[in-house]
Amino acid sequence: MSSSTSPARLLTCFALALALAASPVRPARAVTIDLVTVGNAGNANDTTGYGAVNYEYQIGKYEVTISQYAAFLNAVAKTDTYDLYNGAMASTGNIAGIVQGGSPGNITYSVLDNAGNSGNRPITYVNWWAVARFANWMANGQPTGPQNATTTENGAYAVNGNNDGDVPNKNSINPNTGLPPTFYMPTENEWYKAAYYSPTLNGGAGGYYTFATQSNDFPGNTSGSGVGNQANYNNGVYAVTGSADYVEAQNYLTDVGAFSASPSYYGTFDQSGNVYEWNDLTGTFIGNGGGVRGGNWFDIWFNLQSSRRSQPAAASDLGYAGFRLAAPVAVPEPSTYAMALAGLACCYSLFRRRRAR
């Protein structure tokens, strides 16, 4: 056998085909959500009664940003039928980031320069319904068009024109794709585990930290220092200004991931501080409320703890709350399987040709 037909060469060919199957190929989109995998399925609840999840899943590494939400608005809110934009996103200096322009039927949305580019800061002034619609849009492949069943009104959640009242369960199947939703709002247990759990605690038996910075000690609030256990909150001075004085027009949000040495065990950032984050509680019927956790930039350390939670009305546009999305563990798309099979067929053809010589 010649060197070109060596077992090593054939093994390389097969490895390439398998790599294609393991690496989903997705079309370019306006918004990319960086995800981390939360493993260690079957962990027990914390003493607070939260955190047990018996399956692997993924969750956003960062909070959804102002730029990402502006892209969403520009895709589906030329006519903003269901109030996805709140004017406070432009007028409230502490968190301002998106300004509305254009004309009725052709509304546009631009990221503000609010004491520096606002684009990588977390979006706020969103309610449960707006978060569900963003999740639907992501689950539907980020389509462009009016707010209807194929863009914002169905997908992960059948919101169907509602902006108040009882919230719907998460769909097991996205009716627009025939598959489980690829993005959704994390349940409270999913959010909690990603923030506070570590399988290395208690001698490898697993356990929970008090803060989402892998610490039981309350954090500092210095960004960009390379020092761990830091977060955007008020520890006597505000993290952004380093001053105890509150200024109404001052931005107080930090870029997502600014505290780069302070991830959770699974690699998420800012689940303590910056902004509170919406969660979907149990993910099943919960009346007209949603959950928020994590604390924010004006809170003291007490509200950043794992024991602190709130359950506001789902229709509340909270100026102190944003969100991150969750997703199932990635499964290769059909096109990826086709590529892998093509690679295997190529390997087989090469092997047959070489043997025939």
Annotate each predicted stretch with a short phrase:
Residues 51-52, 58-188, 194-222:
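Active-site microenvironments of metalloenzymes and redox enzymes
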Residues 11-23:
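Bacterial N-terminal signal peptides
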Residues 354-357:
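Short, charged juxtamembrane terminal tails flanking transmembrane helices
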Residues 29-30, 258-264, 285-331:
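Disulfide-stabilized, aromatic/cysteine-rich ligand-recognition loop
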Residues 44-61, 222-236, 302-320, 351:
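Short, polar loop/linker segments at the starts of domains and inter-domain junctions
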Residues 333-350:
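A short, hydrophobic C-terminal helix/tail in secreted or cell-surface proteins
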Residues 117-119, 170-178, 224-227, 232-272:
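Short, well-ordered junction/capping motifs at the entry into regular secondary structure
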